[in-house]
Amino acid sequence: MTTADQPQAVRDDAVFDLIAQEAERQRTGLELIASENFTSAAVREAQGSVLTNKYAEGYPGKRWYGGCEVVDQVEQLAIDRVKQLFNAEWANVQPHSGSSANLAVYNALIQPGDTVLGMDLSHGGHLTHGNKANFSGMRYQMVAYQLDRETERIDMEEVRRLAHEHKPKMIIAGASAYSRVIDFAAFREIADEVGALLFADIAHIAGLIAAGEHPNALPHAHVVASTTHKTLRGPRGGIILANDPEIAKQLDRTVFPGYQGGPLEHVIAAKAVAFGEALRPEFKDYARQIIKNAQALAGEFQQKGYRVVSGGTDNHLFLLDLRPQGLNGTKATRLLDANHITISKSTLPYDTEKILHGGGIRIGTPAVTTRGMTEAHMTQVADLIDRALKGEDVQAKVHDFAGGFPLP
């Protein structure tokens, strides 16, 4: 028997044991990080397939390597499915991540030093929307819009004022910690007023858009980028969508040969599987349940006296302000981690805590919804989190509760 024929456990016990530990952690814990989810077995099988052996620089029908007749079909299938999913004229499925997709959008459509208007990171934006530690903040002149202090929602008149004042070449509509519907039509209206391109980053809400549970960005945005995991429930990776053929050409050239060489065809195959799953009627039910669960869970916390940022949620996530409880995001994360409840710490609009700690936590329901939880289970989820935040040891109860919901 060759090494390649041996079972994984025989070939490398150290790695296999760690994978088994992670599988057990996922099985017995409560996963409430808004950007995480559980893929289907079919997605994992595709990603772990022999397609990982194949180099395929270029695009279907235009490769630099021979032997690409099969991976051409795989990639084209992914392209066709994601175009159908988002009603797009063009798609690129090669970006390795959401950040690399965003990088390609910037470099294809604007120049270094150009002004870009995006959401402030501390108000729910993303690192790639202009943070000074990120390429976006280093290479471009970034202007940030913030949420309304009272409503904690996007203030479109403030966006308009900043757009007219700074005349950005690009406006970004999208967020990583914003719980309300994004009005892409209103963003496009402002972009047109100042002659800017509208870039929609839908990484967090892509699955909700695909299911019709959030307005589609593409009829309004010049370009759309997203991850393929999170609410879309696929492998970790990125996509870019557009309708304008000239913009599409620029984006294709920027992804390859501009920033990437060989695409990860095993990941693209897994993307194709996930897109196929998202096209099924039951995915609409899943996306709808994500939102129902998030709203129910937010309501449970409000009944317990916690402050939910903006008063609720329209999507898959919400933010809890823990400052009234004498906690910050870092302290809360430690308390919850000790009980095998995973969330992410978060800054809050107009936060008074240091950015490294944040004044609260971000909670999301995609993963627990994948496991089969419904609104009825959110009472117990909220109770376990509340007790853990108060210093109780609820680890055994978390294990018992989570163990009743199988992983896909």
Swiss-Prot record:
* A Pfam short name: SHMT
Can you provide one Gene Ontology molecular function annotated for this UniProt record? Answer: glycine hydroxymethyltransferase activity
List the record's Gene Ontology CC terms alphabetically.
cytoplasm; cytosol
Residues bearing N6-(pyridoxal phosphate)lysine are 230
> What domain of life does the native source organism fall in?
Bacteria
Q: What class of enzyme is it?
A: transferase
> Would the keyword Mitochondrion be found if you checked this record's keyword annotation?
no
What cofactors does the UniProt entry give for this protein?
A: pyridoxal 5'-phosphate
Subunit arrangement? Homodimer.
- Write the protein's name: Serine hydroxymethyltransferase
Instruction: Supply the source organism's classification.
Output: Bacteria, Thermotogati, Deinococcota, Deinococci, Deinococcales
Underlying gene: glyA
